[in-house]
């Protein structure tokens, strides 16, 4: 039973530990991601941030427990930190997005409904008019926006973002942040990794400082004011 006035959890990490070849990547990590919140994880390189997200997605084994308290269908959207494209494949932005929006191969054409939905998604992420651009010629920032568009339809209950602003210009970062705020207003929970402390201040409800263990966790403004988080971040990323 959740006490009155307390936002119920969507995801709970309980004593999560991960080791690889006797190296402890995460040690007894416990934290709670509240429903409808923007929860940001910060920490130095090698702190286990991406590892924790990967465990939350069920992609790697771990010790401990990760509990999900879904309100709906439990759909998860995911934008990874890195995404590689085979330059020999003539796949366009529309082809890629159509693969998950219609039940036939794209070689038979893209349905009118799928094409309209794809155009709308691309407008949302600032890629209006790039439907027929090959993925292989897109910049890293543009590829990241394509992945974000793919993660948003249908609206996920949990959106997992691993350094989503990487490779984006100032305008792209602003669009991303506006989109995160809109998603939060729609009831989507956002769990993200960021090295940009100004972005964290603008977006986060709660912050977890991770360095293989939870260093501290709490409301964003209070946590950032109480701890020298910038000292933990990679050089050049302490904005």
What are these regions (language model features)?
Residues 112-130:
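Conserved ABC ATPase "signature" region
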Residues 134-138:
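Conserved ABC ATPase signature
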Residues 159-163:
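Catalytic Walker B motif of ABC-type/P-loop ATPase nucleotide-binding domains
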Residues 170-172:
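Helix N-cap at the start of a conserved alpha-helix in ABC-type nucleotide-binding domains
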Residues 194-195:
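H-loop/switch region of ABC-family ATPase nucleotide-binding domains
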Residues 200-202:
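A short, surface-exposed alpha-helical micro-motif characterized by mixed small hydrophobic
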Residues 213-236:
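Conserved beta-strand-loop-alpha-helix hinge in the C-terminal portion
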């Amino acid at each position: 039973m959740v006490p009155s006035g307390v936002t119920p959890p969507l995801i709970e990490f309980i004593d999560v530990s991960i080791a690889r070849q006797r190296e402890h990547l995460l040690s007894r990590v416990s934290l709670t991601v509240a429903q409808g919140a923007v929860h940001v994880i910060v920490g130095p390189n090698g702190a286990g941030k991406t590892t924790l997200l990967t465990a939350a997605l069920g992609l790697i084994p771990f010790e401990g427990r990760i509990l999900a308290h879904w309100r709906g269908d439990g759909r998860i959207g995911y934008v990874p930190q890195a995404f590689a494209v085979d330059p020999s494949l003539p796949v366009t932005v529309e082809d890629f997005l159509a693969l998950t929006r219609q039940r036939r191969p794209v070689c038979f054409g893209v349905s009118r409904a799928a094409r309209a939905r794809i155009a709308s998604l691309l407008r949302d992420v600032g890629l209006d008019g790039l439907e027929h651009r090959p993925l292989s010629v897109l910049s890293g920032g543009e590829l990241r926006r394509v992945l974000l568009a793919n993660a948003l339809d249908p609206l996920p209950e949990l959106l997992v973002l691993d350094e989503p602003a990487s490779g984006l210009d100032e305008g792209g970062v602003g669009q991303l942040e506006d989109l995160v705020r809109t998603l939060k207003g729609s009831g989507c929970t956002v769990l993200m990794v960021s090295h940009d402390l100004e972005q964290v201040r603008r977006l986060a409800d709660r912050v977890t400082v991770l360095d293989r263990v939870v260093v501290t966790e709490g409301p964003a403004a209070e946590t950032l004011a109480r701890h020298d988080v910038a000292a933990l971040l990679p050089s050049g990323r302490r904005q």
